[in-house]
């Protein structure tokens, strides 16, 4: 299962761009909250067709640059979850993978 969490701060976009992004989100059945300077959404479930990533890729040229990132937590059965991080910069979607590295357990007195 994947859990996406997005809060992006946008440089101000026009009403036409907002409508265009809403239309793209509807094509992917993704519920978003968008205004002239923000984009926010959460999604949890299967994403085998990577529709959330495709949505982000499709809106990147419209947005141009966004501050913040989209975090995707990939929940594994072994509780050693993986992470994917997405950013929009220069009209392109950038991607990084990540893992949480745990230190040794300690007793708190």
Regions found by a protein language model. Name each.
Residues 23-109:
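Charged interaction segments
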């Amino acid at each position: 299962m994947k859990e996406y969490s997005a809060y992006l701060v946008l440089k101000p976009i026009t009403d036409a761009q907002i409508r265009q992004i809403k239309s793209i989100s509807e094509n992917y059945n993704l519920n978003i909250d968008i205004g002239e300077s923000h984009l926010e959404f959460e999604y949890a479930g299967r994403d085998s067709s990577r529709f959330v990533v495709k949505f982000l890729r499709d809106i990147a040229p419209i947005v141009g640059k966004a501050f913040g990132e989209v975090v995707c937590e990939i929940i594994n059965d072994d509780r050693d979850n993986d992470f994917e991080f997405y950013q929009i910069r220069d009209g392109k979607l950038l991607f990084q993978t990540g893992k949480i590295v745990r230190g040794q357990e300690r007793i708190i007195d």
